[in-house]
Amino acid sequence: MMFHDLSERERQVLSIIIQAYVMNASPVGSRYIARNYNLGLSDATIRNVMADLEDAGYISQPHTSAGRVPTDKGYRYYVDLIMRVQGIDDEEINRIDRNFRLLKYDPKDSADILQAAAKVLGSISQQLSVVISPRLSNALFERLDLVVLSSSRIMVVLSIQSLFVRTIVMELSLEVSRQQIDNVIDLLNQRLSGLTLREIRNSISRRLADCDKDRELLNMIVGSADNLFDDTPVLERLYIAGAEHIVNQPEFDQPQKVRDLVCMIEDKNRMVELLEKEGRVKPVTSSGMDVSISIGRENSATTAEDFTVVTTPYYVGNTIGRLGVLGPKRMDYERVVRLVNYMADRLSHSLS
């Protein structure tokens, strides 16, 4: 998106229009600006500045109002060239801490932690919050255990990167003793521990080729490697919260907007696509982290054209997850960026 240079006066007026529209959800007129902001400009002068901003595509006039509202281009200019993001303050941190304390979750269970983070971010931001767990292809395999369920079934339990546990039930086509199971567990842990799941998928046959003992059971494990050591399915990686908050915003007075939101929430693959697509990056000076912001038609999904998506990565060892919020373009960008950035930092520490 190309911008032409705005004068300081134009930048001031654009910034005020965006801030006032975010606060009041009503189109902003020149008289409102003249009365409420000490710019030292007359109503007529402000009106001329607004006309120039409209001609340049930064604001537009709804059919039913004399005021103006920001366009996608206006929001983008504001986010890229005007907005300054400060670090999160103690009051906000205390609110987040209180929200976490009110939730009942297991601090040792990664799925519980991610769901709790989504709930807190949704509640604090009043937007739809989404947390995506890391893809596990680059996660380190730590340990495998086999649990006998019956004479013909075993449960394979994988411990990954200290935090993630995967369980898969396998049908046995042969009888095995406890000693055979223990032998296979020891061998697999010895040969595979410390490798990434991708490395295991690509090399497990070769790594176990010289093992003749308990070969039938080993062959079953090797034959199931693509499922055992695969990435977590999308549906299991996605944690969504905050729908009850976002629908209270004025934008959702229109039933079609609610339907669009529901469609997005139900399409898990599209939701992951929205969050994992890198938008324009906004550096957050206070933390050194980058927050990605996609506004309106910058989003890949047509149902997301009236929304902004703000996301950032979080880190678990050498794996990367992503969290963020989805809300109307009329959002408090500085605050949302601060919250998303802080929650990612907190999540990285909680899962490390």
Curated annotation (Swiss-Prot):
GO terms for biological process: negative regulation of DNA-templated transcription. Keywords: Repressor, Stress response, Transcription, Transcription regulation. The keyword Transcription regulation applies. It holds the Pfam family HrcA. One of its GO terms (molecular function) is DNA binding. Signal peptide: none annotated. SUPFAM superfamilies: GAF domain-like (SSF55781), Winged helix' DNA-binding domain (SSF46785). The keyword Repressor applies. Belongs to the HrcA family. Negative regulator of class I heat shock genes (grpE-dnaK-dnaJ and groELS operons). Prevents heat-shock induction of these operons. This is Heat-inducible transcription repressor HrcA.
